[in-house]
């Protein structure tokens, strides 16, 4: 199974997500695509660390790796996730996108 992936437009609305995202976070495409990332799942994605990432860090760089976010989701419980993201520009239609992959590390233990 692939890691969950979500693609955002520059204004942080969801362009699309992969099947792994929908399964992992128990959401449907019709209630996700076109919505602002912070509004997803009754605002469950309005996470301070995610805001920091999208509003402060990403505008200053083109990508980041292993940005740790912890959050307690209503339907799936507490999750510890590593986010990787990059900004891309599609010249064909002059669209700026943000691609985010999410690795759930909740069950992993620190190696000693």
Predicted regions and their residues:
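PAS-family sensory domains
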Residues: 70-72, 83-87, 101
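Beta-strand residues that line the small-molecule/cofactor-binding core
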Residues: 66, 78-82, 97
